[in-house]
Regions:
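Bacterial signal peptide processing site
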Residues: 58-60
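Coil residues (strongly favoring Ser/Thr
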Residues: 107-108, 118, 181, 268, ...
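Structured C-terminal subdomain patch of bacterial secreted/periplasmic proteins
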Residues: 243-272, 364-449
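Basic- and aromatic-lined ligand-binding clefts that recognize polyanionic substrates
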Residues: 148-163, 265-331
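A short, structured surface patch at a secondary-structure boundary
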Residues: 96, 102-207, 212-219
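Flexible, glycine-rich surface segments
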Residues: 282-283, 301-378
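C-terminal motif of bacterial Sec signal peptides marking the signal peptidase cleavage site
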Residues: 53-56
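Cysteine-centered motifs
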Residues: 17, 30-33
Length: 449
């Protein structure tokens, strides 16, 4: 038998070579393959091949050890200072991490996320082996930057659009509620999936090859995040809609910056918008203070603002620490329930009616956009001073091609423009800030529509 043929025989017996992982080599398995006269040649080749395999195994072992010998990290997360009440971001074991909280009734859902880029993931995504603290071992591991995402709330769409991530949105909850005209058209043509709420929603999500499903929970009948979680699709519940201030709601853009690998861009947007907002807020406050000194009657310069609407004789309104209350305050108005610390309030219509003659203006009358719609539901509101004075403002001044309202999509990332818009409605005039785009008019008087 020629030497080359013998080598081929050995190659065909390659399974025995894997025994080198255990430093074992059995020539008895090879003896039947060759003649006695070729035994010496076989031994020589075996020694040669064995040396190669042993060298390879040692190198493989070194690689394996390099991948698994990650230094144990500190057990404390280095969180950043944020204004948000519902998310935290920081560093742990050398990677970005986030904690997201959602309040559902009396319960608070807490979810943790570990975000690894390709370099971090190369060291392994097993959090226990990476030395993560025990309370982080059940965290969701996300490979960033994300590429394909389903954004199931219009707020999530708004953050992504502001960051230039339109093409990363491959699924939305319902395309008819999208304001952005390009994304709306894609949803109409089914190049962006409308997931919906029916039994087929999960199947649609699973067919999209997603890096992440962005969802939210209200505790209502349409919640399906638990079913999504059971599919093993990566899921993140966001709760920006529960934030109590415009800047806290804007700050969620930082989390999107991490998810898509553009943190610097997200931070820049946040800083610029925060500076504009705080500049305008300070100017409004200083103008009001000066006016109060001149007139000696501060109440004349703080219009009393009502919010909400009556359903079946029960008035539903935002609490004194809510997003609406804080925006009204920053715009120079006096929210009628500012002293209440609740998020949401309910009153009998009679209780609200007692305020009728002291209410200067009315904002956010639920989803109703016309005088006739409001009167058809509750005729008694005609006796409220703000209604008589035709100072009722709805937030649906910017709409999309379908049924979308930009107050819930684009306004969340432009708080300074939103503040300017509402201040104009409440005060009639607004201090000028050159960096603020005054073309955005989400709030509009329902009598002028």
């Amino acid at each position: 038998m020629k030497f080359y043929d013998r080598l081929l025989k050995i190659k065909k017996l390659s399974p025995f070579c894997h025994s080198f992982h255990g430093l074992r080599f059995s020539f008895s398995e090879c003896l039947p393959c060759v003649s006695r006269s070729g035994l010496l040649s076989l031994l020589w080749v075996g020694a040669l091949v064995g040396g190669v395999f042993l060298t390879g195994c040692r190198e493989e072992l070194k690689d394996l050890q390099a991948k698994t010998s990650v230094e144990k990290c500190s057990e404390s997360v280095q969180f950043e200072s944020v204004e948000s009440d519902y998310f935290s971001i920081g560093k742990l074991c050398g990677v970005d991490v986030a904690v997201v909280r959602s309040v559902v009734g009396k319960d608070t859902l807490v979810h943790k996320y570990v975000m690894m880029d390709s370099a971090a993931a190369a060291l392994g995504t097993d959090l226990q082996r990476r030395g993560f603290p025990e309370d982080w071992l059940s965290a969701v591991v996300l490979r960033v930057p994300l590429n394909r995402v389903a954004a199931l709330s219009t707020s999530q769409v708004g953050y992504m659009l502001r960051l230039g991530l339109r093409d990363n949105i491959v699924g939305v909850s319902d395309g008819q509620y999208i304001v952005d005209s390009i994304l709306y058209e894609r949803a109409q043509k089914n190049t962006v999936a409308s997931i919906g709420y029916d039994a087929g929603a999960l199947e649609k999500l699973m067919a999209l090859n997603l890096d992440l499903v962005l969802d939210f929970t209200t505790g209502g009948d349409y919640d399906n995040y638990e079913q999504i979680a059971r599919t093993n699709l990566p899921l993140m519940l966001t709760s920006e809609w529960q934030e109590n201030t415009p800047l806290a709601k804007l700050e969620w853009i930082k989390l999107y910056g991490i998810l898509f690998g553009i943190r610097a861009q997200a931070d820049s947007i946040y800083r610029q918008e925060k500076e504009k907002y705080e500049t305008l807020k300070a100017l409004i406050a200083s103008t009001d203070s000066l006016s109060s000194l001149v007139s000696r009657h501060s109440s004349e310069h703080c219009p009393r603002v009502l919010a909400g609407m009556s359903y079946g004789g029960v008035w539903h309104a935002s609490g004194g620490k809510s997003f609406t209350a804080n925006l009204v305050r920053d715009a120079g108005g006096c929210y009628v329930w500012a002293s209440d610390t609740s998020r949401e309030l309910t009153f009998s219509f009679e209780e609200v009616y007692a305020l009728a003659d002291s209410v200067d203006m009315w904002v956010n009358p639920s989803a109703f956009g016309t005088v006739d719609e409001i009167l058809s539901l509750e005729p008694r509101v005609k006796n409220i001073k703000a209604f008589r004075d035709k100072l009722v403002f709805q937030n649906d001044g910017l709409k999309g091609p379908g049924a979308g309202n930009d107050f819930y999509e684009g306004a969340i990332t432009r708080p300074a423009e939103l503040l300017w818009n509402l201040t104009k409605c409440i005060k009639g005039s607004v201090p000028r800030v050159n960096s603020i785009d005054t073309s955005y008019k989400w709030y509009r008087n329902i009598y002028n529509f």
